[in-house]
Design a protein with these regions (language model features):
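Core catalytic alpha/beta fold that binds nucleotide/phospho-ligands
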Residues: 1-254
């Protein structure tokens, strides 16, 4: 068996004349290798059942059914495999976005923030694990011609106790007054905004999560009522814009 990594549910969004993002689901499936099957086929066993040898040119035309033996992996191995899947997935998505934009370029990973070698566009990745027991992950990428940008895709909610540990006092006070359903969404959106700014500003995790974005909460609540596929919020305390893509569960700071 050969692992085949591919993207599904691709979505491309142009945020302005110099900024584009893409999201997708990355899947890993198993596919048959003709060479492996042919080399390992036990014709001696087939002869026991009076099954004649099969010519190579007819081998692939057969209606094959195959099964894989169940494999028990450690939690560490599963996490490693998922990280590898996500790493490959974001780079496949970058290539898809580059192709969509009709750009001929490759990624320079020698410094952060990442940039395209020829066009010098800024690149930022994000990925998130599944919110169920499947092995699928969601991935996201942003390309900005103007300046460094941040992106965060997140399937899972952020626990209230985690927010209480990292968020500012102003944020906690404002969040506590919200109904539970709104509270959970705002906690998650703030987390995604913080993650995006961490990628832009190169904050440490604790420093970035502790930044105070309480002034954005009213605008975020308004954004939740907006049915648009992309909702853009002007950040009053910087010249960055914040885009919320609800269907893709993605936040972009650009």
């Amino acid at each position: 068996m050969i692992a085949d990594i591919h993207l599904t549910h691709l979505s491309y969004t142009q945020l302005d004349t110099m900024t584009w993002c893409a999201t997708a689901q990355v899947r890993e499936s198993l596919c048959l290798s003709f060479d492996t099957l042919w080399d390992k086929a036990s014709w001696s066993r087939l002869s026991v059942f009076n099954i004649p040898p099969i010519a190579p040119n007819k081998f692939c035309a057969l209606n094959w059914q195959y099964y894989t033996a169940p494999v028990t992996l450690s939690a560490r191995k599963i996490a490693h495999n998922q990280r590898q899947l996500q790493r490959t997935g974001v780079r496949l998505l970058l290539q898809a976005l580059i192709s969509e934009l009709e750009i001929s370029d490759t990624l320079d990973e020698s410094n952060f923030p990442y940039r395209l070698i020829n066009n010098k566009y800024y690149v930022c990745f994000s990925h998130t694990g599944p919110n169920d027991k499947s092995l699928n992950s969601n991935v996201a990428v942003i390309i900005s011609h103007h300046r460094s940008a941040g992106i965060d895709i997140e399937n899972n909610n952020v626990a209230w106790k985690v927010a209480q540990r990292f968020y500012s006092d102003n944020e906690i006070s404002a969040i506590q007054s919200l109904p539970t359903t709104q509270r959970d969404i705002i906690i998650k959106l703030l987390w995604q905004i913080k993650e995006s700014f961490i990628k832009i500003r190169q904050y440490t995790l604790a420093q970035g999560l502790g930044m105070d974005y309480a002034y954005l909460i009213t605008d975020l609540l308004d954004a939740l009522r907006d049915p648009s596929p992309v909702v853009v919020i002007a950040n009053r305390q910087s010249d960055y814009h914040i885009a919320f893509l609800p269907i893709q569960q993605t936040v972009v700071v650009y």
